Amino acid sequence: MAKKSKIAKNEQRKEVVAHHAARRAELKRTAVAVTAGEEERAAARLALQRLPRDASPTRVRNRDAADGRPRGTLRKFGLSRIRVREMAHAGELPGVTKSSW
């Protein structure tokens, strides 16, 4: 079980990313645009650097929805590999069966 503070911090980061997503995308588009002038591109890069650090989607961590485990998370289920295995064995994941051959 992850610390509650780590889970809460990650949720806060998700909100910050969502809040700044449109502005960030616009600035990135301007910063790499060939048609924009060099000064305009430099200003866009500077404005991009001024955004909060947590506005970058890279800072959001995929965590287990059940207990917040940060590693080994399967995106398809939103759960950690350990939790997926436990739930699959218990028959709690529809359509998932233990393979045997």
UniProtKB/Swiss-Prot annotation:
Under the heading SUPFAM superfamilies, the entry gives: Glucocorticoid receptor-like (DNA-binding domain) (SSF57716)
Q: Which GO terms describe its biological process?
A: translation
Q: Which UniProt keywords apply?
A: Ribonucleoprotein, Ribosomal protein, RNA-binding, rRNA-binding
A single Gene Ontology CC annotation of this entry is:
small ribosomal subunit
Instruction: Spell out the InterPro entries in the cross-references.
Output: Ribosomal_uS14 (IPR001209), Ribosomal_uS14_bac/plastid (IPR023036)
Q: Where in the sequence does UniProt note compositional bias of the Basic and acidic residues kind?
A: 8-21, 61-70
Q: Does the keyword Acyltransferase apply?
A: no
In residue numbers, the region (Disordered) covers: 1-21, 49-73
Q: Which GO terms describe its molecular function?
A: rRNA binding; structural constituent of ribosome
What family does this chain come from, according to its entry? Belongs to the universal ribosomal protein uS14 family.
According to its UniProt entry, what is the function of this protein?
Answer: Binds 16S rRNA, required for the assembly of 30S particles and may also be responsible for determining the conformation of the 16S rRNA at the A site.
Q: Please give the subunit comment from the record.
A: Part of the 30S ribosomal subunit. Contacts proteins S3 and S10.
Q: Which NCBIfam families match?
A: PRK08881.1
Protein name (database record): Small ribosomal subunit protein uS14A
- Source organism (scientific name): Kineococcus radiotolerans (strain ATCC BAA-149 / DSM 14245 / SRS30216)
List the gene name: rpsN
